[in-house]
Amino acid sequence: MKKSAFVLVAVFFGLATSPAFPQDIAAGLKEALAVGTGNAVQTLSKSNGYFGDAAVKILLPEKMQTVAEVLKKAGYQKEVDDFVLSMNRAAEQAAPKARPIFEDAVRKMSFEDAQKILKGSSTAATDYFKTKTSSQLTDVFKPVVSDSMNQAGATRSYKALTDRYNSMVPFGKMDTFDLDRYVTGKALDGMFLKVGQEEAKIRTNPTARTTDLLKTVFGK
């Protein structure tokens, strides 16, 4: 995070109970949130951004757990693992699409929005982003996820796995479901989790309450 943005946000939270609420402090919050969401996007856009982080890794859908166990025992461990990897790769490819949407939400954040975030819960900023961006993120992520899943072979792997399972368990056929929607939803869950972690850093910075920082902000 840029030092200037960090300093402004530190003071912003330090002035939570003050009657004064300078516009420059609100601007500092917006800048810091822009950097924070950017960090979240950058982290998840990397190779293994999702797959290598247990907190956001996209696992098999619950309804596929039994299917996976049967297939693993039948010698299809690699196919199951490849399928999980391909879902996460699709999420990683879609993640960069979130950056301009978050940036737009920050630009549109009003003075009143900033006040609510300051005085709200520990997840107020993350909740703001969820409210303002979830629908648009879903619309943007899903086609990218779909294309990525096809390129990574996830859709093909899913069909192959279900076909194998159905041929092995004729009386336990697995129902089909919207795989793209599932991966998109999990990708966004992970994105907002990372945004929440960035918000926590902003709120709990141990240097946030020093007089020196106040002097830096106000040029005294």
Give the residues covered by each predicted segment.
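Bacterial N-terminal signal peptides that target proteins for export
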Residues: M1-L8
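Bacterial N-terminal signal peptides
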Residues: L8-A16
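N-terminal Sec/ER secretory leader and immediately downstream segment
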Residues: P22-S86, A91
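Pore-lining and gate-forming transmembrane alpha-helices of multi-pass membrane transport proteins
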Residues: K30, T131, M174-F177, R181, ...
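Residue-level signature of catalytic and energy-coupling elements of molecular machines
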Residues: A40, S110, P206
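Mid-length scaffold segments of soluble, non-membrane domains
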Residues: E79-Q151
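An amphipathic alpha-helical core segment
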Residues: V144-K186
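A cross-kingdom marker for long, charged
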Residues: L188-K220
